[in-house]
Amino acid sequence: HVLTDAAEETAQLLDTLTMGTFSLSRMNTVTANDLKNQNVQAFLRVIRRGEGTSDQDGYRRHFGGELFTSYADHPRKVITKTFAGRKLSSSAAGAYQFLTSTWDETARIMGLKDFTPASQDLGAVGRIAARGALDDVKAGRFDLAIKKVAKEWASMPGSPYGQPVISLATARNVYTSAGGAITA
């Protein structure tokens, strides 16, 4: 995957502004081989559990629970639901609840051509890499990886967004039950 010069300049500026905590250019380093890592697979299960998409239909789930039918592209549909008396609107979709804008950025950088389960998995690993957590996931530095992706997925422990999150204990349990190893 090759970023255009303008995209690379933007990515470098973002890397600088975030002091390296968020680096779009890291997404370019992710390959399908990263999906073969057991810790990566287990970590993806944690995210899906947090996002409420761990069931069979998770890859086809819109925000709020409705299902979409085509994997040709992100469904690009904003859905409004009422939770705890508050109306919330979101374009989040798929196993990792990608917003339309996040998916477009991810797909463009990573060269993803559809919204199939394989592309969603690869895109999620790209977002993990962008947050500087992929090496931590692979090495079993679970708590550190969770901390780094909490700004990417609002359902992760420590997320600053004020939405419901899964507990760190639940996240660890899902991770180890899926074969993930915690080393630190």
Residue ranges and their predicted role:
Residues 1-113, 122-184:
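Cell-wall polysaccharide-cleaving catalytic domain and substrate-binding groove, primarily
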